[in-house]
């Protein structure tokens, strides 16, 4: 998103990418922040509340693997999720439950990240149909509305602009960005 995104580019943002697991990146002062070992912004392991009130990791709630697991448990095939991103065949109750869980997890991750870093924006993207990305973004904003953000500057929550190819493009851009940006 930092290199290939379109439109207004915030200087400080957290990027979430839905793939097999949820991943991401942290951009500070207009530059990718890799951290000491290169894993900064790896949002998947962030602790978030689960539906049972216990602590889960974000990737346990907000990943395509979780959606596939839910589909298989309900007797639905998830094979097509991995083959193409334009249209998914998922029953509405399963899709709604997955989006709600993902949005709730994202909201808590955004709150935690915002408490540490003054983020201008959070961008949500991934290997999924555009309508589902739109709905995840909308429900994440609604979940943030329900959290106590006292003392924390709430970032804008927006959709990413690169889409399903962001993971591959981002990986290809890292050496270029390190050398030239």
Language-model segments: residues:
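ATP-binding/phosphotransfer module of carbohydrate and carboxylate kinases, centering on a glycine-rich
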Residues: 3-9, 50-181
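Glycine-rich phosphate-binding loop of actin/hexokinase-like ATP-binding domains
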Residues: 4-62
